[in-house]
Amino acid sequence: MVEKTKGRKEEVVTREYTINLHKRLHGCTFKKKAPNAIKEIRKFAQKAMGTKDVRVDVKLNKQIWSRGIRSVPRRVRVRIARKRNDDEDAKEELYSLVTVAKIPAGTLKGLGPQIIEEDDE
């Protein structure tokens, strides 16, 4: 019999992504742009990490709302970490934590997804 190994969605991992909010919020009502941006970031993290439980960091929320409800940044660089849920009575075994990533000098162009080695922050 072949031994079952852990699936790729089961491992704890951290990745950096650039999310193009402009494309995801095109045609959205002005007064709903910032709330919808947060929803789109959650949706992106669910798809990328395969977890239903997504937690958005306060600093990321402040960055999205920094220019008001209408003027959301076109692109945002985020770090998504899939982590184990320590609560015993939690529904999901894993959750995703979305934080702001440090942007290298220059622009966001040409930066693809990157796997981050675990360094205890």
UniProtKB/Swiss-Prot annotation:
The gene behind this protein is RPL31
Q: Name one GO molecular function term.
A: structural constituent of ribosome
Which keywords does this chain's UniProt record carry?
A: Ribonucleoprotein, Ribosomal protein
Which family does the UniProt entry place this protein in? Answer: Belongs to the eukaryotic ribosomal protein eL31 family.
GO cellular component annotations, sorted alphabetically? cytosolic large ribosomal subunit
Lineage, top-rank taxon, reads Eukaryota
Please state what the protein is called: Large ribosomal subunit protein eL31
Does Ribonucleoprotein count among this protein's keywords? yes
The cross-references to PANTHER family, in alphabetical order and at most eight, read: 60S RIBOSOMAL PROTEIN L31, LARGE RIBOSOMAL SUBUNIT PROTEIN EL31X-RELATED
An individual GO BP term: cytoplasmic translation
Pfam families according to UniProt: Ribosomal_L31e (PF01198)
